Curated annotation (Swiss-Prot):
Its EC number is 2.7.1.21. ATP binds at residues 9-16. GO terms for biological process: DNA biosynthetic process; thymidine metabolic process. This is Thymidine kinase. It comes from Enterobacteria phage T4. Belongs to the thymidine kinase family. Keywords: ATP-binding, DNA synthesis, Kinase, Nucleotide-binding, Transferase.
Length: 193
């Protein structure tokens, strides 16, 4: 039985690398995969999933108004798809998460979504919130704080190291993101008042 799986972690835990390795395992066995990523993710490449360890793969772009279920039906008509992979799934819209679950339930094809759980302010992303609610299986990858403890939070810093307290939830640009344990994240956010 296929499942909708959400693999989540703070920044720099290897989410994209895990996705690319899992997709490679399918392809190595002669199976076809569908790799997707939201259009808003342009940091490393517009049309590829790129891992910080240097591996990458071409991806299909998801726009905010795209019906992923309909796109899957079109792609499936071209070739049998054995697994769907979604990088940066936190950026999905609620309805798009439900479209992923429809792929699982209608076609019995596994969907593996990877992303952040929370933003720099500790708030759930829309896509992550829905995935946490309806995924069949949740997997947490471990990121490491500078103190050596498990990092579950992400902080946003300006290039000069100044922490950011407020702002848009999604910001791809001059900011730097660091993974922190809850203790160090709380200490950082308290400094901001």
């Amino acid at each position: 039985m296929a499942s909708l799986i959400f693999t989540y972690a703070a920044m720099n835990a290897g989410k994209s690398a895990s996705l690319l390795i899992a997709a490679h395992n399918y392809k190595e066995r002669g199976m076809s995969v569908l790799v997707l990523k939201p259009a808003i993710d342009t940091r490393d490449s517009v049309c590829e999933v790129v891992s910080r360890i240097g591996i990458k793969q071409e991806a299909n772009i998801i726009t905010d108004d795209m019906d992923i279920f309909e796109f899957y039906k079109w792609a499936e008509a071209q070739k049998d798809i054995h697994c769907v992979f979604v990088d940066e799934a936190q950026f999905l819209k609620t309805e798009q998460v439900h479209q992923l679950s429809r792929i699982v339930d209608t076609y019995n094809v596994p969907v593996m979504a990877y992303g952040l759980r929370t933003d720099f302010a500790g708030k759930l992303f829309e896509g992550s919130k829905e995935l946490l609610a309806i995924a069949d299986k949740l997997i947490e990858l471990k990121a490491v704080c500078h103190c050596g403890k498990k990092a579950i939070m992400t902080a946003r810093l300006m290039e000069d190291g100044t922490p950011v307290k407020e702002g848009n939830q999604i910001c791809i640009g001059d900011e730097i993101y660091v993974s922190l344990c809850r203790k160090h994240w709380n200490e950082l956010t308290k400094k901001l008042g």
